[in-house]
Amino acid sequence: MGSGNVQVHRAGHEAFNQRDFEAMTKQYADTITWTDHAQGRTFRTRQEFTDDFLPGWVQTSSDIRIDGPRYLDAGQTVVCTFTVAGTHDGPLGPFPATGKEFALPLCEMWHFDSSGQVIGGDLYYDQVSLLAQLGLMPQSSNA
């Protein structure tokens, strides 16, 4: 039997897919350390994460969703691999919408304190793969 942390992580992803960022982060501490390693950005508060990070994904892809999550309970850390998929119908940094669909594998860790509150996270993904799928850089010719 795993800890309740997996259920919190799963509920957070379900809330993301519903665009309910407040529900997604209701188990987050006010002060967190959440790092998007691909972008080199760290968020220090729940409010910053909710207001600045999460909406950026939806701005880039209004139909973005988390597909096929697999959760690994490691006690006070839950590791999840999943795919974010959607249509690039909004700006991505300096790049305008391409209208292309994408499917990007991610690995995410949520870190919990002893009371089950989320105190941080780490997100890993390949930005080059995303840009290639969107036609914003050449795809590798290697097989």
Summary of predicted features, one role per range:
Residues 1-143:
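C-terminal and inter-domain tail/linker signature
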